[in-house]
């Protein structure tokens, strides 16, 4: 006998242990002979990470697909693994070392990396245990890590191959530079922070004019939020159609403080409507300016150190062509070495003293910050390794255009194309110690040798230098003669961008570059489930690498899920204090309740607004199923292997089997089309509404009656439907359903398999007549209950029922279902009439009008007054909200989640208004 209540805290670890001991999720477990493969690779969470709501949604949806296809008999692999998370992991270990007063630079690179591996062994990967608590059914025996031996081998193979194909190269370009972490970072690691700053308007004197701050003809005004970068200005840009400046194009201005003569160039980047219409161009310190600089062949002058301090001394690019007068030199010396923000204040002072500061305006604007270092990043000109993304992107664009890979929802394809068709070279190097060290070695003259191993690089270098004539040949020969070959090459210290190894994930985890059986079986993978924020950083790059090295797309479908927000629609963040920890929710409500809630709310293209109250509600759904199973047990329901669907004779049983067939199709269609919310909704409606509320209720007289054949049939039918329910719900609610499956095997019996390996339901039973008959009864009783509720009829009151205009079918149903109608709708005599009695509330069902004479049961006038008062109150609220939402200022300035919440309130009030109006009309008509 089942326990009285379901205890998730007891059942979930028990079931997890059962799965683990049975090795239930290994690749191919439960598959039919020669089954088609189904593969998903997990988006590898950071080794430093812990489970957040985004992970919970992402992995719940993956697990639904995986469990569903496993039950459909496919050869399933859900490949788990973790990302080495270069910057994040290095920071964690550095912080730990600093607690012991040890700086990273106090250690050798090898010693530090050893510390990182020690940390991973002790603390890394806690997220996998958390995912297991969620119920994730990955093949945990195949766990991979982007720095493990096999994946490192794949990374070397890819880098060396792309380099030798000319698709990886070194270049000097602008990067996002984190001056705290001292490394280039990706766009994904940059956060935009709104800050209250200033817009400084500077006067740049025209060459050949005597500068007069009172005479606009002697200068051109530019505005900037970053005065410190003016030291690296190499042009002023104006729009080619701007009549105010057309006569100045081609002329020079003299850069204050510096004395550099820089040209006025015509470029569409300048906006005539913004500020003065003229903008300073600093190619070495602004991404847009860098592009302007390329178009006009302007020099790029870097005036910052890697720590973002001013660097003027010995800066050849800065000093080139300048007249270093004693006055200027003194100013430069004063600025040299200053922190960028200290220098900003000093430069503004100097500009003001020289009459070059026209005005200062308060200006709120976005400043990019490193998400790990937490300081403003610098667009920084530095030599880095790059991949030719434009070339690699071409096949990846074609794959989506030609439908070999599809995005769901389809609108994300536009985002993909926008990114891919405007792609820039991919900066793949990082100035870190933790990561895949770039397999490049430099000879004594700076020549690069790229090979998989140092031995191969040294061999290539020796061959190259010994074929030369001159000093380098002699130098190398000397090292070889003195047994010092190790001095010939110096390895590049940089590591690869974490996304580089992640881009190989779908095939490297299967053993590539070796042609393993797993690679042949499970590549290409079927679907990638991911958030929209990494479509470019990860999805696009997997497409590039998969097509280049496997000559096949890594997946045929990319399902892009939405964000999980708080109940008000606000993005979760620690600063707002609205972060919800999924483990807390699992502790309180159970994993199944959390999973089902996320599934119900996972509508395509709509963010999930997570309210813990909803999770409590869906926990009640699990309780409902548990109690339904207990009810079945108490009524001696047991599995009967001899039960055949077509043998069912009772209309109520034939009805539930028909509805089961329909629900199974809806759930299957929902999952296969990635409409998870529709699948969950269909399951909820069938289990709660049809099975529990109606079917079991309609069976009570059967179980209490004396017809043994009807009892036996109904018991077998209930057992069959419950088994199908467990299967249909299993992908969404795996723990409870697996427990119920085991507990209902029958006395002294065991199931043939775990539920996770049971065959997916495909019932094929349709009895339209029985379905129409019972659904008519459900609609009739529901309509009567609705009227009673709307009109405040006391629950115990028995009302007569009068039916007007009934045809032969309805009359026959009224007779056949007489006892059920009276019991479920709480009505007395049922009669037919030609007209509705006075004082009756009416509903229309098919051709008939159903009348409830209520005049003797309620005070119709008082009820009308109550409804009128409620309707007036709701109408007043609608007017207030409509006025608020018609205020353009409110809509534009209020946080988006507040506006959305008000819109939802308005929709709720309008719905209430409609219902109250219907109820009021009914009362008045009855009176």
Swiss-Prot record:
<dbReference type="GO" id="GO:0006438">
    <property type="term" value="P:valyl-tRNA aminoacylation"/>
</dbReference>
<dbReference type="InterPro" id="IPR037118">
    <property type="entry name" value="Val-tRNA_synth_C_sf"/>
</dbReference>
<dbReference type="GO" id="GO:0005829">
    <property type="term" value="C:cytosol"/>
</dbReference>
<dbReference type="InterPro" id="IPR014729">
    <property type="entry name" value="Rossmann-like_a/b/a_fold"/>
</dbReference>
<dbReference type="GO" id="GO:0002161">
    <property type="term" value="F:aminoacyl-tRNA deacylase activity"/>
</dbReference>
<feature type="coiled-coil region">
    <location>
        <begin position="856"/>
        <end position="917"/>
    </location>
</feature>
<protein>
    <recommendedName>
        <fullName>Valine--tRNA ligase</fullName>
        <ecNumber>6.1.1.9</ecNumber>
    </recommendedName>
</protein>
<keyword id="KW-0547">Nucleotide-binding</keyword>
<dbReference type="InterPro" id="IPR019499">
    <property type="entry name" value="Val-tRNA_synth_tRNA-bd"/>
</dbReference>
<dbReference type="InterPro" id="IPR009008">
    <property type="entry name" value="Val/Leu/Ile-tRNA-synth_edit"/>
</dbReference>
<keyword id="KW-0436">Ligase</keyword>
<dbReference type="InterPro" id="IPR033705">
    <property type="entry name" value="Anticodon_Ia_Val"/>
</dbReference>
<comment type="function">
    <text>Catalyzes the attachment of valine to tRNA(Val). As ValRS can inadvertently accommodate and process structurally similar amino acids such as threonine, to avoid such errors, it has a 'posttransfer' editing activity that hydrolyzes mischarged Thr-tRNA(Val) in a tRNA-dependent manner.</text>
</comment>
<feature type="binding site">
    <location>
        <position position="574"/>
    </location>
    <ligand>
        <name>ATP</name>
    </ligand>
</feature>
<keyword id="KW-0648">Protein biosynthesis</keyword>
<keyword id="KW-0963">Cytoplasm</keyword>
<dbReference type="InterPro" id="IPR013155">
    <property type="entry name" value="M/V/L/I-tRNA-synth_anticd-bd"/>
</dbReference>
<comment type="subunit">
    <text>Monomer.</text>
</comment>
<comment type="similarity">
    <text>Belongs to the class-I aminoacyl-tRNA synthetase family. ValS type 1 subfamily.</text>
</comment>
<dbReference type="InterPro" id="IPR001412">
    <property type="entry name" value="aa-tRNA-synth_I_CS"/>
</dbReference>
<feature type="short sequence motif" description="'KMSKS' region">
    <location>
        <begin position="571"/>
        <end position="575"/>
    </location>
</feature>
<dbReference type="InterPro" id="IPR009080">
    <property type="entry name" value="tRNAsynth_Ia_anticodon-bd"/>
</dbReference>
<feature type="short sequence motif" description="'HIGH' region">
    <location>
        <begin position="45"/>
        <end position="55"/>
    </location>
</feature>
<keyword id="KW-0175">Coiled coil</keyword>
<keyword id="KW-0030">Aminoacyl-tRNA synthetase</keyword>
<dbReference type="InterPro" id="IPR002303">
    <property type="entry name" value="Valyl-tRNA_ligase"/>
</dbReference>
<dbReference type="GO" id="GO:0004832">
    <property type="term" value="F:valine-tRNA ligase activity"/>
</dbReference>
<dbReference type="Pfam" id="PF00133">
    <property type="entry name" value="tRNA-synt_1"/>
</dbReference>
<dbReference type="GO" id="GO:0005524">
    <property type="term" value="F:ATP binding"/>
</dbReference>
<dbReference type="Pfam" id="PF10458">
    <property type="entry name" value="Val_tRNA-synt_C"/>
</dbReference>
<dbReference type="Pfam" id="PF08264">
    <property type="entry name" value="Anticodon_1"/>
</dbReference>
<keyword id="KW-0067">ATP-binding</keyword>
<dbReference type="InterPro" id="IPR010978">
    <property type="entry name" value="tRNA-bd_arm"/>
</dbReference>
<dbReference type="InterPro" id="IPR002300">
    <property type="entry name" value="aa-tRNA-synth_Ia"/>
</dbReference>
């Amino acid at each position: 006998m089942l326990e009285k209540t379901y205890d998730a805290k007891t059942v979930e670890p028990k079931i997890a242990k059962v799965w683990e001991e049975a090795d239930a999720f290994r690749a191919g477990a439960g598959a039919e002979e020669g089954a088609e493969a189904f593969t998903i690779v997990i988006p590898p969470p950071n080794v430093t990470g812990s489970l957040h709501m985004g992970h919970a949604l992402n992995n719940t949806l993956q697990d639904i697909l995986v469990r569903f296809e496993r039950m459909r008999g496919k050869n399933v692999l859900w490949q788990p693994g973790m990302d080495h998370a270069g910057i994040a992991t290095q920071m964690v270990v550095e912080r730990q070392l600093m607690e012991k007063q040890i700086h990273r630079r106090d250690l050798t690179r090898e010693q530090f990396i050893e510390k990182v591996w020690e940390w991973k062994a002790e603390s890394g990967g806690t997220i996998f245990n958390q995912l297991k608590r969620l119920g994730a059914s990955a093949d945990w025996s195949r766990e991979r890590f982007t720095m493990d031996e096999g994946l490192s081998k794949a990374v070397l193979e890819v880098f060396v191959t792309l380099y030798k194909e000319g698709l990886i190269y070194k270049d000097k370009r602008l990067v996002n530079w984190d001056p705290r972490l001292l490394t280039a970072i990706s766009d994904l690691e940059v956060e935009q922070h709104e800050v209250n700053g200033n817009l400084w308007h500077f006067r740049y004197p025209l060459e050949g004019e005597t500068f007069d701050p009172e005479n606009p003809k002697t200068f051109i005004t530019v505005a900037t939020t970053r005065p410190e970068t003016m030291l690296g200005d190499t042009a002023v840009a104006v729009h080619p159609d701007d009549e105010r400046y057309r006569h100045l194009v081609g002329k020079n201005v003299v850069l204050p403080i510096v004395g550099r003569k820089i040209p006025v160039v015509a470029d569409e980047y300048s906006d005539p409507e913004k500020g003065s219409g003229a903008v300073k161009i600093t190619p070495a310190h602004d991404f847009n300016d860098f592009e302007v600089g390329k178009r006009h062949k302007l020099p790029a002058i870097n005036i910052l150190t890697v720590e973002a301090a001013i660097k003027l001394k010995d800066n050849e690019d800065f000093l080139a062509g300048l007249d270093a007068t004693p006055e200027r030199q003194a100013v430069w010396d004063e600025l040299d070495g200053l922190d960028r923000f200290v220098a900003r204040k000093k430069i503004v002072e100097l500009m003001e003293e020289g009459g070059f500061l026209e005005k200062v305006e308060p200006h709120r604007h976005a400043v990019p910050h490193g998400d790990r270092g937490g300081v403003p990043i610098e667009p920084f000109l530095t030599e880095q390794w790059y991949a030719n993304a434009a070339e690699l992107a071409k096949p990846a664009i074609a794959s989506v255009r030609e439908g070999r890979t599809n995005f769901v929802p389809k609108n994300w394809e536009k985002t993909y194309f926008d990114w891919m068709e405007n792609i820039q070279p991919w900066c793949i190097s990082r100035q870190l110690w933790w990561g895949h060290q770039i397999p490049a070695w430099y000879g004594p003259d700076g020549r690069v040798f790229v090979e998989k191993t140092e031995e191969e690089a040294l061999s290539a270098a020796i061959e190259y230098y010994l074929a030369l004539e001159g000093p380098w040949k002699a130098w190398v020969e000397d090292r070889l003669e003195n047994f010092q070959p190790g001095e010939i090459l110096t390895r590049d210290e940089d590591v690869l961008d974490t996304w580089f190894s992640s881009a190989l994930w779908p095939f490297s985890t299967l053993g590539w570059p070796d042609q393993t059986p797993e690679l042949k079986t499970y590549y290409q993978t079927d679907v990638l489930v991911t958030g929209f924020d990494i479509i470019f950083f990860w999805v696009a790059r997997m497409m590039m690498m998969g097509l280049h090295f496997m000559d096949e797309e890594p997946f045929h479908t990319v399902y892009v899920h939405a964000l999980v927000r708080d109940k008000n629609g606000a993005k979760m963040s620690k600063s707002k204090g609205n972060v919800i920890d999924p483990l807390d929710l699992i502790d309180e409500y159970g994993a199944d309740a959390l999973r089902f809630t996320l599934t119900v709310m996972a509508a395509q293209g709509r963010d999930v607004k997570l309210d813990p109250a909803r999770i409590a509600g869906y926990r009640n759904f699990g309780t409902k199923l548990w109690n339904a199973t207990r009810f079945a047990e108490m009524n001696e329901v047991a599995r009967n292997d001899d039960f055949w669907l077509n043998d069912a004779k009772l209309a109520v049983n034939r009805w539930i089997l028909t509805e089961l067939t329909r629900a199974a199709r809806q759930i299957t269609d929902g999952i296969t089309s990635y409409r998870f919310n529709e699948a969950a909704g269909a399951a909820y409606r069938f289990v709660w509404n049809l099975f529990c509320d109606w079917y079991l209720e309609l069976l009570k007289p059967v179980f209490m009656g004396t017809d043994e054949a009807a009892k036996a049939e109904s018991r077998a039918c209930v057992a069959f439907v419950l088994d199908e329910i467990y299967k249909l719900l299993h992908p969404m609610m795996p723990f409870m359903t697996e427990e119920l499956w085991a507990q209902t095997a029958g006395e002294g019996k065991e199931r043939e398999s775990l539920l996770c390996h049971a065959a997916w339901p495909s019932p094929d039973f349709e009895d339209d007549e029985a379905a129409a008959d019972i659904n008519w009864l459900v609609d009739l009783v529901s309509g009567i209950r609705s009227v009673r509720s709307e009109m405040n009829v006391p629950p115990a009151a028995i009302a007569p029922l009068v039916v007007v205009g009934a045809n032969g079918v309805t009359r026959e149903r009224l007779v056949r279902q007489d006892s059920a109608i009276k019991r479920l709708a709480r009505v007395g005599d049922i009669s037919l009439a030609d007209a509705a009695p006075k004082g009756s509330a009416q509903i229309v069902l098919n051709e008939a009008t159903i009348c409830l004479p209520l005049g003797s049961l309620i005070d119709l006038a008082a009820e009308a007054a109550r409804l009128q008062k409620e309707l007036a109150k709701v109408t007043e609220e609608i007017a207030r909200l409509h006025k608020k939402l018609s205020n353009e200022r409110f809509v534009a300035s209020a946080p988006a989640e507040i506006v959305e919440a008000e819109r939802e309130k308005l929709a709720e009030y309008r719905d209430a208004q409609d219902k109250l109006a219907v109820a009021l009309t009914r009362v008045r008509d009855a009176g």
